[in-house]
Amino acid sequence: MQVQLEDASRLADRFEALLEAKGVSIPAHALTGADMLPLWHVLKKLREGFNGIPDDLRNEYSAGIAVHDLAAKVLAVEGHPNFDMLVPHLQMLTQGAVHLTQEPPGNADVYNNLIEIYWACLLMANGVEVDLDHPVHSPGNNPDVIALDQGNPARAYAFKTVRSPHTQNLMDHLIKGVEQIERSGANEGIVAFQLTPRILQANLWPKGKYYIDWRYPAAIALELLNQMITLLSGVTRTNCTELSEL
């Protein structure tokens, strides 16, 4: 993804204006840790640009691209009839911080909330009516996002953030996701694994080094993803009997 600073600045202004119009404020609190950047700080950098050596700014570059991408997805669906369902999620997002190079804590609700907003926006951008589980007032029994067909559940999506490399943890996530989908009443569903915590940024951008061509880190990322896919495929094949009984 190539982002021009002028375009990023305009997008940051539009994103903040949209949030303000929906009653969502972005508190300018102090940084909460070396690995976390509050949303206001990232938007500020998108406006002003990034200065410094790559090692010092790798967190800000990464966060800037991520927030720019999310903001673009949200702005693309601001006229969708289901947009107000995103507001509680956006409120929660603005009150938290963006975890970057380190693995987020297990209770990082704001981090987990990112993928739900992102996927809902992708569906809405394609004209799909959605039902979004509330980010706070929810017992966790329902899928995170449900695509509707004439108001009825058609396809359910359960997102699971994978932090542990152990296969049993993956299986537990998969079973819980299948159970959530079955309770939704949808005819079909997808359990999607959020694998970002398993990709350590240090492997993609080693300290003290840089790439002259983006295809080098892209190839590393692809290899890491392929390794994870192989692991996930092995988990499902090994436990197919248990899954078929759900």
What are these regions (language model features)?
Residues 141, 152, 185-187:
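Residue-level preference for short coil/turn positions at secondary-structure junctions
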Residues 123, 144-163:
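Conserved catalytic cores of phosphodiester-cleaving nucleases, focusing on short active-site segments
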Residues 1-126, 160-246:
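Charged, structured surface patches that assemble and position nucleic-acid processing machinery
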Residues 125-148:
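A short acidic/basic microdomain associated with nuclease active sites
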Residues 135-138, 150, 160-162, 196:
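An acidic- and aromatic-residue-enriched active-site/binding cleft used to recognize and process polar
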